[in-house]
């Protein structure tokens, strides 16, 4: 997951990016999370933010936790957040700062 996330961490934010094809010029939030999980063999097709609300197992994972609501998704891996922000055109990034989880459904890949 981390290696795949690193591959796209410098790509710009692109609405809908990562949904038509895995290798894209930029990624949105769900495209980014999908790409990273796909890189670990955990996804076969890209999911939307809403799809992630019911994907995997409920609750926090031991290592990987996904936070999703209908308009946004991000994940935390061993305390590091993999997230996007479209406001300043920065795409997928690893971030040390946490963010509010209010309103998010919490899921995780089984076993992780």
What would you call each of these model-derived segments?
Residues 14-16, 28, 68, 105:
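Compositionally biased, intrinsically disordered low-complexity regions enriched in proline and serine
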Residues 2, 34-112:
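...with weaker cross-activation on analogous glycine-rich loops/strands in unrelated enzymes
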Residues 21-40:
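Active-site nucleophilic cysteine motif
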Residues 8-26:
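Active-site nucleophile-His-acid catalytic modules used for acyl/amide transfer and hydrolysis
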């Amino acid at each position: 997951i981390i290696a795949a996330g690193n591959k796209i961490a410098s790509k710009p934010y692109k609405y809908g990016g990562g949904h038509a094809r895995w290798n894209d010029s930029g990624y949105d939030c769900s495209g980014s999370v999908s790409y990273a999980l796909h890189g670990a063999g955990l996804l076969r097709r890209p999911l939307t933010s809403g799809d992630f609300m019911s994907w995997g197992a409920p609750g926090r994972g031991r290592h990987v936790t996904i936070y999703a609501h209908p308009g946004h998704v991000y994940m935390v891996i061993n305390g590091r957040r993999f997230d996007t922000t479209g406001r300043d055109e920065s795409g997928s990034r690893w971030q040390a700062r946490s963010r509010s989880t209010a309103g998010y459904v919490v899921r995780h890949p089984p076993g992780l």
